[in-house]
């Protein structure tokens, strides 16, 4: 479908609207200074043409060279070489999807782009290099602009830009034609038919342009959306490669330097890659943040929160990125950009129908954007704003992509000496700190509290109770973990070769000083023990017994079980350090009384049991005196020190 100044009114006979031959006078004067403007803008310059005017039919060009002039270039290589008739057909196909059908197509394009996936956009990157030039072989080097009137508007093209301007507005033309028809009712002249035909042609052009441009806005929105998504895929792929390269240099550079060989990559490569990533992430972040504030007024906030929940957009983290100015590293800036990108795509998914007025506002969105206000706009205005925003984002992405492309030489493989025999040292495994689990649990609990506070609509009693319980649990958790000390169930390593343990006891026992019967190597050391006389006071006996239990000198030869060698908790040690000798003696007396107050067996029976406890080495074969036998778990087996002294004296 091509339109030329003469071809606009030329066509095939036999159609509905036919213009008869009339005089050419008065054809242009009636439109002077009118909204219709110059008749040449419509493609009308011959009023005496007797050829019939065809309505709603394709027109054929009169000039064969016009095929080359009106090749419509677009931003896609697949459209290059497409004539304007094919473009208009596609515009009407896209524009035919009105209302819900257009929104479904719009949302389907976003979802299938995989931009909302966890791993980002994985769609194949397009090989678009830029806007193709206007294919006009007749245009000389001095011609920078090409103007051609069509029934859908004035086509203005240059080497890089192509516009289709709307020249006739429907409402002004309709009002003007109504006034003209009223005056023509009072005029009885032969030229009235020419005027009526011209007015009908003007109304027809206004209707055609109004219909075409309303559909063209939808087509342009879909085209800009596709450009933006493809550009996102390209930029994310480049940024991912730069980020991987930066991580490689961060890991391999210390290993290379330890090998004694100088690195083969330039010294400023690491900082250059970091600067490129910071530049790209900051530039895109602030551009998208500006676009988000504009498009948020078109979205339904309830649907927006719903889509954010579906595609795992953490609103709390986004709130921190939007309202904090702390210094972020390269990885944090990239994560911030990814989160805001997913949020912007959720906004595009939640754009309302063009005939719907949103009356409810989400409390979460109001916390993110306190200045949010929903605006009611007509369909054309909404689409124009949306198309312009998508086009701006696509242009910004193209600029970032060009910058990253210009530094792609920094991504080449750099041979280092990490595989040499001097660099076979493996990195040490990272040791997990003992408090890592405690810190992780605390952060998870705090994150749960933060989510609850962020999504709460009012400060009610339930919310306060929830926060208080969580904080109380955290306080109790930290108090419990700080006072709890790990205790070893195994005996400590003993350096003395004469000290051995045999864990055969399951009841209450005490350390008992026992002599070695048949070991000659231990005989000189046994003479160092000074006998304790029975005439000593009870307090002295108890004090000696206490010292024998708590002494840790290496010169003593104490035979005990593994359970007795368990290290006492620090708080018990601190408690006993604060007590005097008299207080320790009193406490020991209380323990003895408590153990013997319930049952008091006959003296002879108790003495017999105590002697059996002390004579374990004879009953168990003695094992050269190096191993203790089983102890009784009875309370009557508490030793008496003067009997021990008597037994030791007899054996010497």
From Swiss-Prot:
Question: What membrane topology does the UniProt entry give?
Answer: Single-pass membrane protein
Q: Which organism is it from?
A: Eremothecium gossypii (strain ATCC 10895 / CBS 109.51 / FGSC 9923 / NRRL Y-1056) (Yeast)
Which cysteines in this chain are paired by disulphide bridges?
none
Family annotation (InterPro entries)? INP2
UniProt-recorded name of the protein: Inheritance of peroxisomes protein 2
Q: Which domain of life is it from?
A: Eukaryota
Give the main location: membrane
Gene Ontology biological-process annotations? peroxisome inheritance
Record localization:
Peroxisome membrane
Keyword annotations for this protein, in alphabetical order, are: Glycoprotein, Membrane, Peroxisome, Receptor, Transmembrane, Transmembrane helix
Which residues are modified by glycosylation? Answer: 269, 503, 549
